[in-house]
Amino acid sequence: MQRREFVVGTLAAASAGAYLGNNLSAGESPPSTHTGVAKMPFEQPPLPYPMDALKPLFSEEQVSFHYGKHHAAYFKNLNGLVEGKPEAQMSLDDLVVKGSGAIFNNAAQAWNHTFFWNCLSPTGGREPNGELLAAIVRDFGGMAEFRKLFTDASVKVFGSGWGWLASDKQGKLEIIPAGNADNPLRHGKTPLLTVDVWEHAYYIDYRNERARFVENFWTKVNWDFVAQCYAKAKA
Ligand code: MN
């Protein structure tokens, strides 16, 4: 009974602040915190930059809610759902491909958001080059054409979802608009770039203006990350 209470307590503490880097505040015991965190099979990775580093695409408040509340909640929910189940031993990638129901929804949302943060950079927004640019020109006609197709497809996702750029094993590119938590991995494709078009992704900064958000999204795209994903897709 006491053990159970301890686990529940540390999970709650972790979801509230562990991922924001303030889990070892004064007076808290590091060993017990570490034990609690280690019990969770899935951990939200740190944000790859400070919360205010994506201005003016996103305000600090927008990122703090999106990363600290929404993204964190998918990990917390997932850890609760897999407790004592075989899924606790699976990788997050495997759960995205093979999972079902609520476990899939939370695993994919956990995965998708981590990928989304990596698709952005405070120094992003430059144009891609090399093989990736050549493939974009080959498959879409050029950067301007690709940007328009991806923007339109993402803006038009009905309800909540994601706009994806994905590659097959031959390196052919495809724009995949996806509902809810769907991910190209589920369809045998490798994700290269994504934009989150759930309202929670932009509502603090853009209110209902999804199109204006997706237009601004391009100013922070981390093309180096996209190119790395493309190189791995064809490997
Ligand atoms: Mn989101």
Question: What are the language-model segments listed below?
Answer:
Residues 75, 114-117, 133, 147, ...:
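Extracytoplasmic/secreted envelope proteins and their assembly/folding machinery
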Residues 152-224:
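An amphipathic alpha-helical core segment
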Residues 20-54:
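C-terminal segment of N-terminal export signals and the immediately downstream linker at the start
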Residues 19, 23, 118-128, 207-210:
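Short helix-capping/linker segments at secondary-structure and domain boundaries
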Residues 69, 80-89, 94-98, 102-167:
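All-alpha RGS (Regulator of G-protein Signaling) helical domain and cognate RGS-like helical scaffolds
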Residues 220-234:
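Long, compositionally biased interface segments
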